[in-house]
Amino acid sequence: MKFFSCASCQNQVFFANSQCVSCQTTLGYIASEKDMGSFEQHSPVLWLALNEKYQTKRYKPCYNYQHHQVCNWVIPAESNDIYCESCVLTYTIPTLDNPDHIVYWSRLEHAKRRFLYLMQRLNIMPRPKYNDDDRYGLRFNFLMPEAEHPVLTGHANGVITLNASEADVIYRETTRIKMGENYRTLLGHFRHESGHYYFDL
């Protein structure tokens, strides 16, 4: 993973950061540039880039960044989109009336963004699956299992379903031991299931 720097204080920042730990400048990932941007917030939906090479551009935070703090990507301010290139791929999330579900969702989105960063670097970034007949798009469902409705992680026709319980470290480690696996990670699930998606294209 590439290291980045804050345009305000030059401190090193990381892909997951939403604020510089040194000067508290707002940060966000600019997907079109494959770069972390530093921003001055003129309003909740108008952020001015402080990076010299982006100073003529205006951005806004992804809806899930602004309202749920589960994302740190930004979108061009003039765009009609409200979701970033990562969040737009997520079709279903756990119900948010349970605080644990918000934590699980956040962890899943974080792992998905790391996976998508790699896809960007390889120039095979997936696009959203807008309807069931679209064989080239990709969609993610993050589902919580229920007593009579277990959730199996897998891929089918451009839809990747992940058991959101995998974001619970205890559940995931218990499953790893039960399955006799050397390791079991959220990022690994994204890589594995996306392999089926790309193979089918």
Model-derived segments and spans:
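Active-site-proximal structural scaffolding
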Residues: 13, 77, 108, 155, ...
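Short, solvent-exposed loop/turn and secondary-structure capping segments
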Residues: 21, 96, 173-175, 199-201
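Residues forming anionic-ligand binding surfaces in small-molecule and nucleic-acid pockets
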Residues: 84-93, 164-175
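Generic detector of contiguous secondary-structure segments
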Residues: 16, 147-150, 184
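N-terminal low-structure segments adjacent to metalloprotease catalytic domains
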Residues: 1-129
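Auxiliary, metal-adjacent structural segments of Zn-dependent hydrolase domains
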Residues: 103, 107-169
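Short pre-active-site segment immediately N-terminal to the catalytic Zn-binding motif
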Residues: 169-191
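Active-site recognition of the HExxH zinc-binding catalytic motif
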Residues: 20, 184-201
